[in-house]
């Protein structure tokens, strides 16, 4: 099957390089576009008592995420069409990006690394209307 736009959902982890390499191996033969999406970390999850520093911490975490995506794209040896940093429910953002940017393949890794989440793995399915 020939894809035209591949969206890769990555986490800020070393495994994302392998995920992007797989996407590039699919995209390169057909010159498909490749875009990246990731979740921004929310500092409120880490410390609810440091309210005055939250905005600064949020900005630093966002910048680190941007830098990771830039470095990931540079090491891919393939042009990255767009990068998206989402917050909230990732599946909703993926669906919105797919609809708006005509994505026809989504590649995801495991964003949840706890033992319990691996043992009780589940998936959500959202369907986009056919074009």
Curated annotation (Swiss-Prot):
Q: InterPro entries this protein is in?
A: Rossmann-like_a/b/a_fold (IPR014729), Universal_stress_UspA (IPR006015), UspA (IPR006016)
Q: Which UniProt keywords apply?
A: Cytoplasm
Subcellular location field? Cytoplasm
Assigned GO CC terms = cytoplasm
Pfam short name (any one): Usp
The cross-references to Gene3D superfamilies, in alphabetical order and at most eight, read: HUPs
Protein name (record): Universal stress protein C
Q: Which organism is it from?
A: Salmonella typhi
């Amino acid at each position: 099957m020939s894809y035209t736009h591949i969206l890769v959902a990555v986490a800020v982890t070393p495994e994302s390089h392998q995920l992007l390499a797989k996407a590039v191996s699919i995209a390169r033969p057909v010159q498909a576009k490749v875009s990246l999406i990731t979740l921004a970390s929310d500092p409120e999850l880490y410390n609810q008592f440091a309210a005055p520093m939250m905005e600064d911490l949020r900005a630093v975490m966002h910048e680190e995420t941007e830098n990771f995506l830039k470095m990931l794209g540079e090491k891919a040896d393939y042009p990255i069409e767009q990068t998206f940093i989402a917050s909230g429910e990732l599946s909703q953002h993926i669906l919105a990006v797919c609809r708006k940017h005509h994505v026809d393949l989504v590649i995801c890794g495991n964003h949840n690394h706890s033992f319990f989440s691996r043992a009780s793995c589940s998936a959500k399915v959202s369907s986009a209307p056919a074009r």
